[in-house]
Amino acid sequence: MPVDSRRLQGPESAFSYTLLEKKDANAEESILSADMQKMLIDSKQIRKDKRKPTDARPLFLRTGIISQAKGSAYIEQGNTKLVCGVYGPREVQKKSDFRLNGQLFCEFKFAPFSCQKRRSHQQDNEELVLSGLLREALEAAVCLHHFPKAQVEVNVMVIENDGSPLAAALTCASLALSSASIPMYDLVVGASVRQLPKVLLLDPTKDEEWQPELSHDQNNSNLTVGYMPSMQQVCAYVHEGVSNTEDLEQMLKLVTEYCLKVQPIVQLCLKETVEKMLANEGENKDAE
C-alpha cells in the first residue's frame, strides 16, 4: 500500500497523555472540577450569559432562506447560527447504491469563519462524524419508502458556532425537510445538556461544552438528543464523558422536556410557511 512520506502519520489533534493519567489521590481532580464549575456558574447559580442552569438560549427559526433549494431553514440559538438546504428527491446515480427504499445524504460543514480557529474548506473528521449522526437521526423520522430508488440531500452549514451545533442542526434539518414536503413520521427537535458534578446546564455554549482535555473525571459529560415529541421517541443519543445511570436519566428528562417546549415553535414556523405557500398559489391563479 503506497504511503505518503511527506505527510505526518499522526492524528490531526492531540493532547498530553498526562491529562488522562489517573492520580493516586483524587484531590487534584476535585480541585479542577470545582474551579471549572466556578468559571461556568457563580455562587448564585447564574451562568456567564445571565441564564439559570435550566434556561435555554433565545430561539429563532425561518424557512425559505435558499431559493434554489426545494426546502430550506435557518436557525439562531443564541449565537449559534445554521442554515440548511434540502434538495431532491433525485434519482440515484450509482447502480451500486441502488436500494428499494429512499436514501438520505447528509453533509454537515462548518464555515471557515464559524469557529475561533479557522476551519478547512474540506470536511475533517469531526464534520464527517456529525454528518453520520445527522443522517442516522433523520432516517428514523423520514418516510424513506415514499420515494424508492431516489435520494434526498440535506446540507447543513454552520455560520457561527457557539455551542450545541448538532442539536441546532437536528431542529433546522427537520424544519427544512418539512418545508420541502418530504413525508416524515414526526418533527425532530434537538437539545443538549452539560453535566457538572453538582449541576446540569441546559443548552450549553461553546465555553460550557464538555472538553476531553479539561474534563476527564467522573460526573462530567455532555449529552445531545434528537427527540420526536409526538411519537415520544429518541432518534439520536450522543453522550460524551463519564456519567452514572441516575445522572443520565436526569439529563434525558431535562432535554426531552425542553424539546416538548420547542415543538410548538417549530410547528408555528411550519404553519406560517404553508400559509404563505397557499397565498402565493392563490395570487398566481388570480393573475392567470
Task: Write out the residue ranges for each language-model feature.
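Polyanion-binding surfaces on beta-sheet-dominated domains and ring/shell assemblies
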Residues: 1-288
